[in-house]
């Protein structure tokens, strides 16, 4: 595993993080997760997730033949604030043991292939995922080991869309790695 998480210092010697703000040309990003990439849990890590050629090979592979194949779901999704497991310890100090990260998403293309995929996820929802939002891709070379649940939601109203409602969750002290999306 090649996670690229920050190195946390021991003791009270930690320095303040470095920030960057531009009063004249702020770098802001819009919301919405619009695609989730999914691979079998046993699939091999990507060699370099920032390279389009690496993604092209994995996306072209047949998932019925290799666990290294990556598929994607077009979604309307969000990643709300992670839920932190904060514990108070001696001398009125606090630590974060872990965070529970969640992606809530809807799949609005509910054809037979996507319905079969929903049913396959119900066999056991542990996968490696990456997600894209705006100009960024999240997940690193390893992907995010996440548990996915998906449900078919048929509305009462005739003019409403039938959607698959999904939730992906994982535990991590850190938010996932982020990179400019090479597929845009």
Per-range role (PLM):
Residues 2-102, 144-159:
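Solvent-exposed edge beta-strands and adjacent loop segments
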Residues 19-21, 105, 127, 147, ...:
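Phenylalanine-focused residue identity feature
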Residues 24, 41, 108-112, 132-134, ...:
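Generic structural motif
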Residues 90-112, 159-175:
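Oligomerization/assembly interface segments of phage tail-like spikes and tubes
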Residues 112-115, 152-153:
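Short alpha-helical segments and helix-capping/turn motifs at coil-helix boundaries
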Residues 115-139:
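Short, acidic/charged, Gly/Pro-enriched secondary-structure junctions
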Residues 138-184:
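Mixed-charge, glycine-accented linear interaction segment located at domain edges/termini
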């Amino acid at each position: 595993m090649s996670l690229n998480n920050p190195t946390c210092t021991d003791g009270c010697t930690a320095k303040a993080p470095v920030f960057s703000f531009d009063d004249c040309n702020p770098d802001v990003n819009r919301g919405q997760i619009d695609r989730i990439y999914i691979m079998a849990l046993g699939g091999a890590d990507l060699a370099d997730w920032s390279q389009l050629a690496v993604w092209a090979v994995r996306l072209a592979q047949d998932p019925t033949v290799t666990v290294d194949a990556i598929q994607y779901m077009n979604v309307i999704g969000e990643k709300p604030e992670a839920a932190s497991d904060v514990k108070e310890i001696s001398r009125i100090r606090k630590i974060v043991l872990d965070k529970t990260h969640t992606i809530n998403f809807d799949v609005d293309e509910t054809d037979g292939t996507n319905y079969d995929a929903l049913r396959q996820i119900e066999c056991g929802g542990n996968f490696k995922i990456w997600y894209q939002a705006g100009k960024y891709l999240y997940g690193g070379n390893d992907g995010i080991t996440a548990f996915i649940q998906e449900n078919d939601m048929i509305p009462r109203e005739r003019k409403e869309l039938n959607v698959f409602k999904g939730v992906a969750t994982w535990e991590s002290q850190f938010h996932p790695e982020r990179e400019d999306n090479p597929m845009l």
